[in-house]
Each structure stands twice: as C-alpha cells, then as structure tokens.
A protein has these predicted regions:
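Accessory RNA-recognition modules of RNA-modification enzymes
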Residues: 1-135
Length: 135
C-alpha cells in the first residue's frame, strides 16, 4: 500500500477527526500557535477521487510487493511511476489505478510511464539524484 491510501482502512468520519487532530496538534505543539475554538473539518462529499493534486515519483528500481517477490516466475519492469511507500523516501510503488484522483489522471500517468519505458528515458535514482525523470 502506498502512502496515499494509508487512511483508507478507517471510516471516513474517523479519518476526518484524526486529520483535524493532527493539524491542531501540529499548530499548537510545533508552531506554538494559540488556537481558537476549531470548527469541525469539512469533508469531501465523495470518499474516492476527491484529490485535485497528487505528486508521483519516477524510480528505476520500483518497490516490489510481497506477492511479487514470492512469484519467482514473473518478470517485472522495475521502472515505475508511483507513490512513496509509507515512511520511506526511497521506495516507490508502481500505481496502476489510484482511487484518490479522478480520471483522466490514471490514464495520463500510465501513458507517461509507458512512453518513458518505450523510449528508454532514464528513470530517477532517488539515492544518487540521477536520471532524467524524477518527480
């Protein structure tokens, strides 16, 4: 699971409560901001395809899932365009379908990834800061 969907196993109303608490805690504890009474967070009317901005990262060595690692017969193109795994800046999961942003986002991302693969463009190496395509 990528970092984008890390909240999806929790009910939406609970997600909103946690996210509001996270923002409030950050402003008070780190920012030392004296907070007035905070109104409840306004949620999206939709629980999928509600994001208007996402940032994807290219990687020449995509992160494999446990299922992919166990499948010894499969060959995977490790050049990926996706999201960071949770808590890792250097591990990128290839995303075939993202539930956070509406189409044509998925089609555009996949077309760009496939074009880069077909035209042998150099995918980024996050550790070495090399490669034509990064994020």
């Amino acid at each position: 699971m990528c970092g984008g969907c890390k909240w999806q196993h929790i009910g939406y109303e609970t997600q909103l409560q946690y996210k509001q608490q996270q923002v409030t805690d950050t402003l008070q504890r780190i920012g030392k901001v004296q907070m007035p009474a905070v109104q409840p967070i306004l949620g999206s009317p939709s629980q999928t395809y509600y994001r208007n901005k996402l940032e994807f990262t290219f990687s020449f060595m995509g992160w494999l899932t446990e299922e992919q690692i166990k499948d010894e017969t499969a060959q995977y193109d490790r050049r990926v365009l996706g999201f960071h795994t949770p808590a890792r800046f250097d591990k990128i999961i290839d995303i075939n379908h993202c539930w956070l942003q509406p189409d044509p986002s998925n089609q555009i991302r996949l077309a760009i990834r496939d074009y880069a693969r077909e035209n042998m463009l150099r995918f980024g190496n996050i550790i070495k800061q090399t490669g034509l395509l990064r994020n």
